[in-house]
Swiss-Prot record:
Ca(2+) 2 binds at N222, V223, G225, V227. It comes from Thermomonospora curvata (strain ATCC 19995 / DSM 43183 / JCM 3096 / KCTC 9072 / NBRC 15933 / NCIMB 10081 / Henssen B9). Cu(+) binds at C269, C274. Gene3D superfamilies: paralog of FGE (formylglycine-generating enzyme). Pfam families: FGE-sulfatase (PF03781). This is Formylglycine-generating enzyme. Keywords: Calcium, Copper, Metal-binding, Oxidoreductase. GO terms for molecular function: cuprous ion binding; formylglycine-generating oxidase activity. Oxidase that catalyzes the conversion of cysteine to 3-oxoalanine on target proteins. 3-oxoalanine modification, which is also named formylglycine (fGly), occurs in the maturation of arylsulfatases and some alkaline phosphatases that use the hydrated form of 3-oxoalanine as a catalytic nucleophile.
Length: 303
């Protein structure tokens, strides 16, 4: 775990629990065997997992909340230290300097010098008009720093998935099996032709406020689409396939790894390319990586 050079304030249980949802302990069926899944992601097998009770944020951490953390601690994010972060190509203002660094399998990502949480599209951009949008350009390290300061932690992948399911058993999405029940959009994802034209039929072509759309059965917002959310676990495509107490009772993932799990999908997910806005879907990134579609929410043990 990273170490931090800021003071961790003492917080009352009531202060920590504010804005969090209590998830009862018990069992649920984790993972999926969706034919549309990416085999290399290791969504399966479907397995029964038992979890202890926990708390989880109702919303993803917002720009306003992260700004309060930075103001209190002087924290500098990984994107700021590196001097750049990844921005979706259509969101980069004309004339903005860019770097040669590219992701060959995803050329729509542009490395933009000066892009960070407070200037998400690069120099000249601002979060002034989106204080209630999820903070982005935050690495796993940054998310752990915020959570530690807030008296919380990141959720395990199992906790995140149990909470995101909202009490439904093996539903495809946090609200059921239909993407747009009764023609209503329930999440912020890409509509149109990816990656050239987003029609914005769901109301957004970038991030949405953290309280947009209806919540799931547990009262959590935006656990599908909007921004990817960091989890505590190291990534593995097959660690969880082995039947053992470690993988079935309060699982915390492998002991070591090179990347951390992210869940939930983002506003850039589209069925033609990345359908990972399904609850069982998962992917990963290195702990120091950041991008314009990745944020987080926190968890905590019962207080």
């Amino acid at each position: 775990m990273p170490s931090f050079d800021f003071d961790i304030p003492r917080r009352s249980p009531q202060e920590i629990a504010k804005g969090m949802v209590a998830i009862p302990g018990g069992t649920f069926r984790m993972g999926g065997e969706d034919p549309d899944a990416f085999p290399e992601d290791g969504e399966g097998p479907v397995r029964t997992v038992r979890l202890s009770p926990f708390l989880i944020d109702r919303y993803a951490v917002s720009n306003r909340q992260f700004a309060a953390f930075v103001k209190a601690t002087g924290y500098v994010t990984d994107a700021e230290r590196y001097g750049w972060s990844f921005v979706f190509h259509a969101h980069v203002a004309p004339g903005t300097p860019v770097m040669d660094a590219v992701v060959p399998e995803a050329p729509w990502w542009v490395a933009v010098p000066g892009a960070y949480w407070k200037a998400p599209e690069g120099p000249g951009s601002s979060i002034t008009d989106r204080p209630n949008h999820p903070v982005v350009h935050v690495s796993w390290n940054d998310a752990v720093a915020y959570a530690t300061w807030a008296g919380k932690r990141l959720p395990t992948e199992a906790e995140w998935e149990m909470a995101a399911r909202g009490g439904l058993d093996q539903a495809r999405y946090p609200w059921g099996n239909e993407l747009t029940p009764r023609g209503r959009h329930r999440c912020n994802i890409w509509q149109g032709t990816f990656p050239v034209h987003d029609t914005g039929e769901d109301g957004y072509t970038g991030t949405a406020p953290v309280n947009a759309f209806a919540p799931n059965g547990y009262g959590l917002y935006n656990v599908a689409g909007n921004v990817w959310e960091w989890c505590a676990d190291w990534w593995s495509a097959d660690w969880h396939a082995t039947e053992s107490p470690a993988t079935r009772i309060d699982p915390r993932g492998p002991e070591t790894g090179t990347a951390r799990v992210t869940k939930g999908g983002s506003f850039l997910c589209h069925e033609s390319y990345c359908n990972r806005y399904r609850v069982a879907a998962r992917t990963c990134n290195t702990p120091d990586s950041s991008a314009a579609h990745t944020g987080f929410r926190c968890a905590a043990d019962p207080l």
